[in-house]
Amino acid sequence: MLKFIFMLMFMFPLSFLKNFYWTVQNLIFLLTFMFMINLSSLNYFNYISYYFGLDMVSYGLILLSFWICGLMLMASEKVFSTNNYEKLFVFMILFLLFMLVLTFSSMSVFMFYLFFEASLIPTLFLILGWGYQPERLQAGVYLLFYTLLASLPLLIGIFYILNSKNTLSFTLLLNYSFSNFNLLYLSLVFAFLVKMPMFLVHLWLPKAHVEAPVSGSMILAGILLKLGGYGLLRMFSLLQISGVKYNYWWISISLVGGVLISLVCLRQTDLKALIAYSSVAHMGIVLSGLLTMTYWGLTGSYALMIAHGLCSSGLFCLANISYERMGSRSLLINKGLLNFMPTLSLWWFLLCSGNMAAPPTLNLLGEISLLNSIVSWSWITMIMLSFLSFFSAAYSLYLFAYSQHGKIYSGVYFFSVGTTREFLLLMLHWLPLNLLILKSNFCMLWI
């Protein structure tokens, strides 16, 4: 594992060399494939040192981080062609990737917290530096304040653990019980609920997505939302008793919120905002499954996190491809795209159907496991879950039908084809999404 961290470190100087944009991208893909070959049976912790170690959950998420970062560089070709500070841009992406790899392989709670917060900085720079509208400053402030405000109690909780137990190693803390202190439970969990994001504290996400460049949206939807889920997975190994007592609050909020957000999706005219709100709905069901703390729930939430990372990232790429041609994200202008870019309609269809968890995508596997776990936790949730599944299909269909069908916008006088780069980009999102269900033991057999 150390070899990958060092390779990433030595790639930093490459980002400042002239015309090394595609070289760095190829190196990230090389890194991904080397990391894939490196997979041994990681059901136990595979230690690098006292502070770093890997297990199956971290492995999948690190692999996803490598993959999405390679695809980010591929999607942001415009930064390179317009010479828009591309060296700094590549450096930001590499720095973010470095922070994410360290976050997912941290074994000490404090180091996890440190890298978890540090990954916010390059994301903020991506939004502020390469975003499209002046409102990106407001989006950046929202992102920063929501995350930092919720993370301060987490830091205090970590220091309390250090003070009372004299260790911060995840593996050693498993021996202790933290059942008697409810405030600690709240402080340790809340930061991750904001990062997920849970309904009621989700407002920063649509703002950040709408203002971010395509690379920012991809990494935000693909990896940064998964940090919250990963943190909860790690924390609930310590907070099991409190979790059984209090988790029903968050589950109820998430499920009701998921349905409300799905209704919000059906009223969106902005492509990016629609995809961002659909992320909140998906993360609501992931959060609910995770908080049931059952085997099905944990494995299903992990599977859906990986699947959503690929699917939602691909949808943001599609929205960006349309945005580059049309100059607008509005559904009122991006309509009748079947006439305008017929070659792209297939990809719209495939990724929208992935978003509604149609077979054979990995989303299906995740959602079925989550439905199982949440219904086994309480059968009353069936009402909300049935609404959630129905509206999930409804807004995915709405997105596809409104953007592809109908009369083409009268201001468009030309016909456009995608480039090979764009098709490869979409292919690399869609293939893993559908092939992973054939190798689902990685998602389902890691506990």
From Swiss-Prot:
| EC supergroup of this enzyme | translocase
Q: What is its main location?
A: mitochondrion
Any single GO molecular-function term of the entry would be: ubiquinone binding
Question: What is the E.C. number?
Answer: 7.1.1.2
Q: Where found in the cell?
A: Mitochondrion membrane
Recorded GO CC terms: mitochondrial membrane; respiratory chain complex I
Bilayer-crossing regions: 28-48, 56-76, 89-109, 110-130, 141-161, 183-203, 213-233, 246-266, 273-293, 298-318, 331-351, 374-394, 409-431
Q: Report what the protein is called.
A: NADH-ubiquinone oxidoreductase chain 4
